[in-house]
Amino acid sequence: MTEHTTSYYAASANAYEPFPTLSESISCDVCVVGGGYTGLSSTLHLAEMGYDVVLLEGARIGFGASGRNGGQLVNSYSRDIDVIEKNYGPDAAKVLGSMMFEGGEIIRERIQRYQIQCDYRPGGLFVALNHKQLETLEEQKANWERYGNTQLELLDASAIRREVDSERYTGALLDRSGGHIHPLNLAIGEADAIRLNGGRVYEQSPVTAIQHTSPAVVSTQHGQVTARYVIVAGNAYLGDKVEPELAKRSMPCGTQVVTTAPLPEEVVRTLIPNNYCVEDCNYLLDYYRLTADNRLLYGGGVVYGARDPDDVERLVMPKLLKTFPQLAGVKIDYRWTGNFLLTLSRMPQFGRLDKNIYYMQGYSGHGVTSTHLAGRLISELLRGDAERFDAFANLPHYPFPGGRSLRIPFTAMGAAYYSLRDRLGV
């Protein structure tokens, strides 16, 4: 059996009744492969609409990125909307821009409707490390307001100093429609909501093959599902055996996270007084927030190719202490790594592998909100309205340069270039 990685989230997860392992042959309307946010959102949307849905998870619900991430509800996509407009044209940007803030709205609605206990707190900060980044945030504010986000505020150096007890930042953009959560508890709550709506969820049921027939047949180690439709939602943890075509268009990447021991109340009150989540504007960014039990959760850096580094704490602690030198000597209780799926365009990849087999993947670090949007869009498609799904599906999906052998060093070289620009402030 494959259990959750040792993390703060796993240690503080809400108790739930485990889901069974698939050990028979069953049939349904829709079979969803993957029990992360993409699969959970898709299954819940469809179950609410009355579909007979089966979700197959190879390990535990939220085992992958959905249960290991920074817990930040970051609006929009990994590519800024002005870049989307430049790359794909104003018509595509208009449609994609109209959906930028929908994923966060879906999450908040789910939390309220199903009373999911996941420590939701509103508000997120994008912090600038130099004047060039602050200018970019000013442009971001204007672009987001153009698409309907009215909950934005620019902060100057003195204002951000009141929000974050660090001397690193020249300013920030506060998005009050952002926020943070306990991501694994959100996943568990959504799985329970699926059960409540009549959906069937199976854990410890890794998919071994998908037959592209009509109906399709999805095989696991001990059972199989015959379904009218299949949704492939494994992302960085799908591997390259089940649907190898998807692996050619994307690359798993690892990010590292540490969580401190609980901090004294007086430290918490000064560190991030309004309990916002924070991410900086570097290409290889740092992100952090406080937890419900007064720990600092801090992540940063990327390992291309999804290798697990030997010493997560050694990689992350210099970043944490550069931001908060006053925490020198703080005890680290948890350290872990998790993989997200990167695309060359930094845009999500949606599409069809066959007339009845669909996929959604590659959120490139912006998956918490975008995955929830994805679930709504696939439910619209199966209901007969493919327009919004196809707004993503029509975007070109480029392979990484260098093929399987050279894509990692080529991508790392590019990241090093942009990191140097960040350090130089250009």
Predicted regions and their residues:
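Extreme N-terminal leader/targeting segments of oxidoreductases
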Residues: 1-30
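Flavin (FAD/FMN) cofactor-binding and adjacent substrate-gating region
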Residues: 2-12, 79-85, 106-189
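N-terminal Rossmann-like FAD-binding beta1-loop-alpha1 element of flavoenzymes
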Residues: 28-55
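Glycine-rich FAD pyrophosphate-binding loop
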Residues: 48-68
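Glycine-rich active-site loop/strand segments that organize a redox cofactor
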Residues: 68-98
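Active-site substrate-recognition segment that forms the wall
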Residues: 105, 113-121, 207-209, 223-355
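Helical element adjacent to the flavin cofactor pocket in flavoenzyme catalytic cores
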Residues: 142-143, 168-228
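C-terminal catalytic lobe of FAD-dependent flavoproteins
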Residues: 306-308, 313-423
